[in-house]
Amino acid sequence: MPGVEESTSYGTPALKVKGKLLLRLHDDGNKIVLRMPFERREELIAGDPKTYFITDHYRDYPWVLVSLKEVQPNALPDLLQLAYRAASPVKKRRV
């Protein structure tokens, strides 16, 4: 994914695109905080609430929490692509 760089956010490992947060490891190390459009977030949560969820803190923001213990590894590339599209400037989306 063009422009993605390793970084940190709130003291945890993160990925950013052009300085904009794409995802980060949650403080507890058991989940990731992933940028996600609201509509898609609701679909993920409705389809698998054990894997995808939010807390009150994230309710008004375009983020979803993803349980690393529950998520299917083959789902990660698609999730990263959705997050990348949500975070990256339109010009950078050549994937």
State each model region's role:
Residues 1-95:
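Charge-dense, helix-prone N-terminal extensions
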